Structure formats: structure tokens, C-alpha cells
């Protein structure tokens, strides 16, 4: 008997059709919406006088990184040394690592990349101990590491908690010949509550104020230091605040949203609606490009269907999958029927429980397309996704590097 190789979940050959040829479940990206989102965010950031370094942790698809860079992105944001190595292998040559570089093995991964003089890398620091460790490690290798001070908020995530801590850390960096202070960074996504909008504006203004203070004190090692913030929900407020503070006049302003590339049918759809409410000049927003497709597996009771889709396939931390359309398996051209009135009520490891709306007729083997909420935690469940055209034909396989 001929040996058979393992098959990767959701893998498909170029030219395959989603409803006829692809083993499901599958991660699906719609080309038209994806390209729209890449253009939309690049235009928004450029028109705001800033640069874009999209957070690659969302998809960890180097092929998407290249599309974003070709559209004008300044660089790619990443979360750790392993992600940085994957992006470098995929052709990325400028990285903001929006995290602290901790641990000698992780430092070694970055040191290897810094042997390439064309590789521009910046990581965050928020504590003198980390500064000392980095200074010692990179000095021993004859390398100089670009670091940025992270400024945070009380009760938030990482980052110095006071302006005085920032100033003291800048002095500690100055004392390390192997380190270069290239900017200041913050993350506003941890600011919540009734006064979140004003709190985010104040936080962005404080970043600029601190950057000006450090620049006036000669702390930076770049003539035009970097100032950066912005996740995927409040990027408009950060852009607006940086503009109001004239940050672009003295600094390289960099925004770092990531989820926009795929968007979603959940939390980022809601966040985008808020952006459009705040910005009446934006007459069109982002489009959901990401779906997960799966078969109806069982219909053991009236009005109840079990879908061959579970926690191994789709995010469930910020809302359950949203049924979108029903397709008859094998029928091409595929005309999907609206099933948005159906509701997923629970997910298990490999199963989703779906209440079937009155008037919706399903049969075993039917294909349901699902929207998701929080794309970062859907992408990481896949090693390959299907990029499809408007006819639902696979035009490219996109590989992840988680």
C-alpha cells in the first residue's frame, strides 16, 4: 500500500472551489475585502500624517505582511523574538517588537538578525534590570540594540507608571553603550471605563509631552525619534491626538493596528462603528474578510444542528461564531442563502451547537460560512488559510507562522 502523507486542516490547491473541493473546516479570506482593508488603513494613517506598522500577531502570515508593506507600511509590529524571526524569514526588514526582550535565548534570536545591517529592529524596555541585561548581552556580542521606553497606566499592562520613571530609565539607557534609545511607546487599549475616550486622549498627549522632554534633554539617539501607540479599536483617537500635539513635526509617529487586515463580525465590527461615529469624514469603513467554513454534521433534534467546527478552529473568547450563509455542498456556481437568524449557542473542542431559525432548511453536509469575533484567536488555530475570489475559488494558500 502506498504511504499516505498527513493532510493539513483547511489546505486547498489553487483553483479549488470552496463548496466542492476543499476539506472543511477551512479558514477563508476574501480577497476583495482583504485588499480593501489594507488600502483603507494605509490611506487613513497616511492622511493622518503618521506611519503604519501593522501588528503582525493578528495573522502571522508573511504573505500578508508583504502586501501591507507594498501598500506603504513603514514596518511590521510583532510581539516576541520568535515572531520576529518568522517575519524576517518572510522578507520583513523593519520590526517594532511591542514588548520587552527578556531572556538570553530570546536575545540571541534577535542578535542573529542584527548581523544583517539592513535589519531595523526596535524593542521596548520599562525597567532598569532589563536595560542592564540587554546592555550586557549585546555589548558582549559587539552589537547595538535599539530600545524604546514603554509608558503605561496604573492598573494596565507593561510600561513605566510615572513620568519620573521614564526619565530615570532614559538615564539608565544612556549609561549602556550597547543600547540606543530610539523612541517612546504606549498602548491605550488597557484604558477602559466611562471616561475611556478622554483618558486615551490624555494618555496620547502625555506620550508626546514625555517625548518632547526626553528630546530636549538629549536622551534620544535618533534625530527624529519614534513615538508610537494604537491598537485596533482606538487608532483614530491616537492619530487625532498625535496630530493635535504636532507630533509629526518632531517625531516619527507610528500607529500599530493589526486586526483591521481581516476585521471581524464581532468586537472589531463594533469598534469600527464607533470610529465611524466619531469621524463623519470617513464614509466607508473596514470590511470583514475572515470567515471559517464548516459542514452541518448532525441534526439530532428539530431546530438543532451540530456543526463540525469547534474551539480548535475558531475564536470563542469575545463572542461565538456568527452564521452567515448556507451553501449546498458541490453545487457550483454557489449561491449562498442567508442564515444569520440562526444562532450558535455553544462550542466544544470540535463541535458547535446551532439553533436553526424557523424557515431555514438544512441537510447533513450543507456548508455554513461563519463570521468570527477577535480574529487574532482564530488565525492561530490554523497553519494555512484559503484566499478566495468573488466566485469562491481558491487563488492562493496563505501560511501562518505561529
Model regions: which residues?
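Active-site-proximal beta-alpha core segment in soluble small-molecule metabolic enzymes
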Residues: 55-194
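A charged N-terminal "starter" segment
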Residues: 1-112, 387, 398-402
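Conserved, mostly hydrophobic/aromatic
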Residues: 34, 57, 87, 149, ...
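Active-site loop/helix belt of alpha/beta enzymes
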Residues: 152-280
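Internal helical hairpin/lid segments
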Residues: 259-331
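C-terminal accessory subdomain/extension
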Residues: 301-402
